């Protein structure tokens, strides 16, 4: 493992001066993260010809992340994904949230974790730990907590993201990372020829506002079936209502890991030969094919467009606070929220 490098990463609107932290292992994989948003800024891995490939979309500096609207590289919290009606009831008390997606709440509203300065509380050559204090009432949620996010790079080309928090009241916690992956390289265009396998037999269909109906439906015989590896674009334009409503894939798949940290997905770049495995202990994964990216100016002159990337956002199911048959959405007072997701790369 090479020595951790730290450099300036621009300046924010309020005058804060974020830093960029670079980790690099002996296999040539490099990970860049920032204390602005605890953001995953860049991941570089070697392709089948030993050439370095930047496999996540991103911006030149902190200003890009501050001004961006697509949650590129973002640590999303306190609750990722959607809450119907922008309201949650905890212990009989209604808590109103921001309506920022029609009448619903998406990714906890406009005051997002990813556009705040986090504090580095620990770092080494192979890891960086960020901390954000989220006070009682933050984003409308009850309870204060200190959210810790640790990025760890290992010598086997694995990047692990570890989330930890202990709330002082019962509250919603559902964290994710919203990185956009293109395994052929961040400037290489469409990912529709990437191949994907999901270890999932079911998904949670949603309505026209992307709020789950409460059903859990089998993928059997549908374009949602990725149990056998197939191209992302093989059926993305099928005349299938969930795909029409989502403008492509933007759905939660039900995972079979039963709370264990296990492999849940695999994606392969058709040109680079780079394979990315996704491991998690979370019950769901949102696969999003960047259906609404348009003329997004990224780093090194890149301009990102629709379906130029795929997100695999490990999570609790969307709107779990309103669906009794979905996994528990509330983290109890004094309990530890502790979850890991890893992205492992190989050829």
PLM features per residue range, with description:
Residues 2-347:
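An exposed, glycine/acidic-rich loop-and-rim segment of catalytic or binding clefts
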């Amino acid at each position: 493992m090479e020595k951790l490098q730290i450099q300036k990463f621009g300046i924010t609107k309020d005058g804060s001066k974020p830093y960029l932290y670079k980790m690099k292992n002996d296999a040539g994989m490099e990970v860049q993260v920032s204390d602005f948003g605890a953001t995953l800024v860049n991941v570089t891995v070697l392709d089948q010809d030993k050439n370095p490939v930047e496999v996540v979309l991103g911006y030149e500096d902190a200003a890009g992340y501050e001004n961006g609207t697509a949650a590129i590289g973002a640590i999303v919290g306190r609750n990722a994904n959607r809450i119907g009606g922008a309201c949650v009831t905890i212990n009989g008390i209604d808590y109103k949230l921001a309506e920022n997606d029609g009448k619903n709440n998406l990714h906890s509203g406009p005051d997002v974790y990813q556009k705040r300065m986090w504090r580095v509380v620990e770092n080494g050559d192979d890891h960086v730990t960020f901390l954000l204090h989220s006070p009682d009432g933050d984003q409308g949620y009850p309870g204060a907590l200190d959210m810790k996010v640790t990025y760890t790079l290992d010598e086997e080309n694995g990047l692990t993201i570890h989330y930890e928090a202990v709330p002082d009241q019962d509250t919603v916690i559902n964290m994710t990372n919203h990185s956009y992956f293109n395994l052929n390289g961040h400037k290489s265009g469409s990912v529709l020829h990437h191949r994907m396998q999901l270890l999932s037999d079911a998904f949670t269909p949603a309505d026209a506002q992307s709020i789950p109906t409460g059903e859990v439906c089998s993928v059997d015989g549908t374009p949602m079936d990725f149990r056998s590896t197939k191209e992302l674009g093989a059926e993305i334009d099928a005349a299938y209502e969930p795909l029409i409503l989502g403008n492509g894939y933007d759905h939660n798949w039900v995972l079979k890991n039963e709370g264990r940290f296990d492999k849940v997905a695999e994606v392969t770049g058709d040109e680079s030969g780079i394979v990315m495995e996704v491991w998690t202990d979370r019950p769901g994964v949102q696969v999003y094919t960047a259906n609404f990216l348009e003329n997004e100016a990224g780093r090194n002159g890149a301009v990102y467009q629709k379906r130029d990337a795929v997100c695999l956002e490990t999570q609790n199911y969307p709107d779990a606070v309103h669906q009794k048959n979905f996994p528990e959405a509330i983290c109890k007072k004094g309990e530890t929220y502790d979850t890991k997701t890893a992205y492992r790369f190989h050829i």
